[in-house]
A protein has these predicted regions:
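Iron-sulfur-associated redox domains of electron-transfer enzymes in respiratory
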Residues: 1-241
């Protein structure tokens, strides 16, 4: 069963002052990746310097794999940070200013499903103004142990809510953890930004790139663009997962 609300309550009971939803930052990631994609495509179509295709992954383990084994492909990687490191950067800038706290006094903790996220926050790129975006990462298993050790009766906790405004998110963020989800979310964002219309798939679900079997691909033709994006009129966007 869905226990998101109980997790928010448990984290508050453990002593965290504010509890945010990484899905908010997943939406931010999609906006950043979508606009980066558009800028690269525009450069390629207008004779500028551009590297395509653009490759995206929020997995620090996968990024490290590319760095070690395929360094010649690094220019193809999206420059966007992963959602939880974006969240840390926003918390220590926008949110710190909003609530009037020195970011040096903040300690940001991410709850993540993968131990590679612990390594990720140590990377020099994950710092701003001499401060780490995220100070610590705990895995979901470690969080479960913390809740148990604290004697919290998780099953009977009331449904809590994330603190605002960094607790809101869309369906695009929800599918981030699904195979092909990041690509589908990016397509939704880019298509609507360029045309002013929703992606022409049933329930915005891009069936050709869904599933675990092999490499999946899809082609989406962009037509009737908004004036600002007329350079994309008739362009076919090809994606693969």
């Amino acid at each position: 069963s869905r226990v998101t609300g109980k997790l928010a309550t448990a984290l508050a009971d453990l002593g965290f002052d504010d509890v945010f939803d990484t899905n908010w930052a997943a939406d931010l990631t999609i906006i950043e990746e979508g606009t980066e994609f558009l800028s690269r495509v525009k450069a390629a179509l207008t004779g500028g310097k551009s590297v395509l295709p653009i490759i995206t992954s929020c997995s620090p383990g996968w990024i490290k794999f590319i760095e070690h084994n395929f360094p010649d492909q690094l220019d193809h990687l999206s420059t966007c940070k992963s959602p939880h490191t974006m969240m840390g950067a926003v918390v220590k800038s926008y949110y710190a200013q909003k609530i009037g706290i020195d970011p040096k006094k903040m300690f940001v903790v991410s709850v993540m499903p993968c131990t590679a996220k612990k390594f990720e926050i140590e990377r020099p790129e994950m710092m701003n103004n001499g401060l780490p975006n995220v100070d610590a990462v705990i895995t979901t298993r470690e969080l479960a142990q913390m809740i148990k050790t604290a004697g919290i009766d998780f099953a009977n906790l009331p449904e809590g809510e994330f603190d605002q405004p960094l607790g809101l998110s869309t369906g695009a963020a929800d599918i981030f953890g699904v195979t092909g989800g990041v690509m589908e979310a990016a397509l939704r964002t880019v298509y609507e930004l360029v045309t002013g219309r929703e992606l022409p798939f049933d329930k915005l679900h891009v069936e050709p790139i869904v599933g675990l079997d092999g490499v999946k691909d899809a082609t989406i033709k962009i037509e009737n663009t908004l004036p600002a994006y007329d350079f994309l009129e008739g362009v076919e966007v090809k994606v693969a997962v």
